[in-house]
């Protein structure tokens, strides 16, 4: 009701009552936001030029480019030997594999569990210190959320607290959940040590696992990307651009790495292989031999087939690109139409007004009168 005088009283801001899930506003100020603004800035992780090297990428994510090692050194300093700190870091990076090794070698596994869990809690407490309790809680696995929260927020300042923490850890061990708990808290550390991941171009290229990198990113908590030229090339191939498709396959064949195309995306290249073996049956295709790494050796027969496929797709790419350039004279890229600059009888090519002898002039799929025409 209005006051007896008939005048309305001016509205005066009052402190709100704290309610679950509702921001606390005092005199127009959001207390939660003000508090969050005063927290240390979360660690941002920048990675560039992955080029499909998924194993190196996953390892860098797990160790946060050395950030976990640095925190372990800061926390334990001279209280742990260098070997102990290295083993703790390895456990955080690869908990399942390290646990399997420890269980084969450790004589007193219960004692090891107790000491290790205590150390992992210390690391987790440190990496979570930049965040609100709400944000940390959302990062915790459901099975161990309550236990991890209790361990993180209880400090062993007195005997009662020490006994409480020790009892929690002992219960984890006695109920045979130690392995599961260690794996869970190691994954929490990996997640909290990096607040935001920034990918600076080229997930795709010559490496064998660009698709695995993308699957890893899909499962990552928060990231953004600046696409690189190779990424855009793959997008063009996905969109159906013939020149991009040829270029993607050519690069893969150049490095003898068909894993992403064949295994990652299930694209069968049998037709290309059949065509290449027929068209270049008597051609060693030495100029198109793949760049083979020591980790991915090929026998001579496979190298020859890959070189034939490499040459076949390269000629297709040159033809298609030349067709595109001819349709767009405004681009002023006629100098890139190299198939039209070849004298197929003499075996020479003219570039910038100068004539060069070609190392090979075996082009059975090219019509000298119409070099851009696909067969």
Task: Please identify what each model-predicted range represents.
Residues 1-375:
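Feature recognizes metal-dependent phosphohydrolase scaffolds
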């Amino acid at each position: 009701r209005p006051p007896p005088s008939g005048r309305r009283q001016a509205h005066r801001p009052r402190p709100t009552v704290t309610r679950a899930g509702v921001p606390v506003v005092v005199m127009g100020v959001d207390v939660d936001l003000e508090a969050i603004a005063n927290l240390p800035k979360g660690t941002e992780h920048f990675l560039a030029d992955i080029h499909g090297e998924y194993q190196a990428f996953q390892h860098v994510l797990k160790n946060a480019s050395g950030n976990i090692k640095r925190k372990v050194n800061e926390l334990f300093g001279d209280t742990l030997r260098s070997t102990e700190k290295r083993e703790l870091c390895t456990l955080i990076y690869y908990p399942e594999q390290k646990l399997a090794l420890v269980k084969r070698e450790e004589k007193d596994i219960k004692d090891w569990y107790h000491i290790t869990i205590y150390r992992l809690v210390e690391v987790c407490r440190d990496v979570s210190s930049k965040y609100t309790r709400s944000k940390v809680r959302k990062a915790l696995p459901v099975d161990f959320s309550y236990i991890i929260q209790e361990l993180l927020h209880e400090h062993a300042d007195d005997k009662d607290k020490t006994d409480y923490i020790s009892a929690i850890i002992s219960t984890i061990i006695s109920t045979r959940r130690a392995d599961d708990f260690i794996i869970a808290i190691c994954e929490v550390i990996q997640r909290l040590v990096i607040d935001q991941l920034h990918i600076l171009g080229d997930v795709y290229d010559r490496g064998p696992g660009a698709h695995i990198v993308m699957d890893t990113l899909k499962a990552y908590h928060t990231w953004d990307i600046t696409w690189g030229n190779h990424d855009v090339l793959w997008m063009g191939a996905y969109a159906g651009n013939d020149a991009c498709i040829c270029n993607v396959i050519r690069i893969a064949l150049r490095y003898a790495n068909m894993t992403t195309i064949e295994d990652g995306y299930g694209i069968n290249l049998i037709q290309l292989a059949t065509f290449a073996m027929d068209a270049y049956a008597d051609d060693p295709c030495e100029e198109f031999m793949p760049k083979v790494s020591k980790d991915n050796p090929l026998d001579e027969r496979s190298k020859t087939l890959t070189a034939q496929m490499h040459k076949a797709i390269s000629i297709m790419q040159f033809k298609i690109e030349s067709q595109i350039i001819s349709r767009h004279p405004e681009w002023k890229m006629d100098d890139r139409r190299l198939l039209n600059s070849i004298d197929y009888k003499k075996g020479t090519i003219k570039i910038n007004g100068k004539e060069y002898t070609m190392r090979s002039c075996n082009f059975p799929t090219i019509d000298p009168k119409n070099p851009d025409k696909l067969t």
